[in-house]
């Protein structure tokens, strides 16, 4: 089970499920700082996330909810928005409440730090990584490339053929492959068009005289540009 995947990819893995069902295995995971995933059910009035660990209560304190929460560089919406979604974490402590029921203290921030140090910091331009689309804007798509750490894919890197909005290619929650385009000052930029084939590879799919359908992408006085594939227009 690889640890450094977009959030939501580990939650259904059998190893992850087995650990969540065992206090002993949760203790072992604490000692090894293993990254796990479970669903965040509630965000309380202090912005702590309550996580369901197969019937055991898990708590991610607000300041452990994401990198940047402690120093104020990231807003609390980064924590609040995780309700009803999978969250990654490492186990930091196992205690009991006043009734003797176990409470497991968790840190998403530590899981993200581990992902940054062991995985994302080692990525280089040209590397191909799994990613999950988290939200779309006019200027590009944001994608989780590991443990909830998000990178931007500018709209002009999504495909060779021009589009008006990333929603023409992606939907939120969609799993894709992405290419590391640049790494500058800790900020990662992604690209997708390199994975859609070259002009020649796309052109080989069509024959002269063949009737095909496409999308009109631009109209000029001298003609219209028709998209046949995301990386082929004529």
Regions found by a protein language model. Give the residues of each.
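Single-stranded RNA-binding regions, centering on S1/OB-family and related RNA-binding modules
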Residues: 1-234
């Amino acid at each position: 089970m690889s640890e450094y995947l977009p959030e939501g990819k580990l939650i259904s893995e059998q190893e992850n499920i087995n650990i969540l069902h065992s206090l002993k295995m949760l203790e072992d995971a604490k000692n090894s700082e293993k990254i796990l995933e479970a669903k965040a059910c509630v965000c309380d009035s202090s912005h702590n996330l309550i996580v369901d660990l197969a019937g055991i209560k898990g708590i991610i304190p607000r300041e452990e909810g994401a990198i940047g929460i402690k120093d104020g560089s990231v807003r609390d919406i980064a924590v609040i928005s995780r309700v009803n979604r999978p969250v990654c974490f490492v186990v930091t402590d196992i205690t009991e409440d006043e009734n003797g029921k176990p409470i497991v203290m968790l840190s998403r921030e530590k899981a993200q730090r581990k992902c940054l140090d062991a995985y994302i910091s080692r990525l280089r331009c040209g590397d191909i990584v799994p990613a999950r689309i988290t939200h779309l804007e006019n200027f590009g798509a944001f994608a989780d490339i590991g443990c909830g750490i998000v990178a931007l894919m500018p709209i002009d890197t999504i495909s060779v053929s021009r589009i008006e909005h990333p929603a023409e290619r992606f939907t939120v929650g969609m799993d894709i492959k992405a290419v590391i385009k640049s790494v500058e000052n800790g900020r990662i930029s992604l690209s997708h068009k390199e994975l859609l084939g070259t002009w020649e590879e796309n052109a080989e799919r069509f024959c002269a005289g063949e009737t095909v359908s496409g999308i009109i992408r631009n109209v000029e006085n001298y003609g219209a540009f028709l998209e046949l594939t995301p990386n082929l227009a004529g």
